[in-house]
Amino acid sequence: MRLMILLALLLVSGSLSAQTQGAIKRVCHVARFELAVACIKKYEGLHGPKHHPYVGYGHKLLPGEKFSPRMTERQADALLRSDLRKLCAMFRDFGRDSLLLATLAYNVGCGKVMKSRIMV
């Protein structure tokens, strides 16, 4: 956390080259993405066979998908990251808020986020 604050202060100060600033922004984005993944894992938990049609860390099976309800943590992690990246891309037009909206959509569903008052 202290590192992110330091990086943010350096960005604001303008004392870094554009290339360095771009690298810092990428690092901060990765850190936020990892934090979102950790939060989803903590609050969703790893779903087992009794949670059908949900597998992994809350992935809802779509028609034609053949994911096992007994997937490993590594497989579940990869599926979560893939889903979250797709949702981030869906909300890309919202800039810095795309990860926040993607995390919310992962939890409540994309349709509910799009119909929500927060999107007005």
Predicted segment positions?
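Cell-wall polysaccharide-cleaving catalytic domain and substrate-binding groove, primarily
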Residues: L3-V120
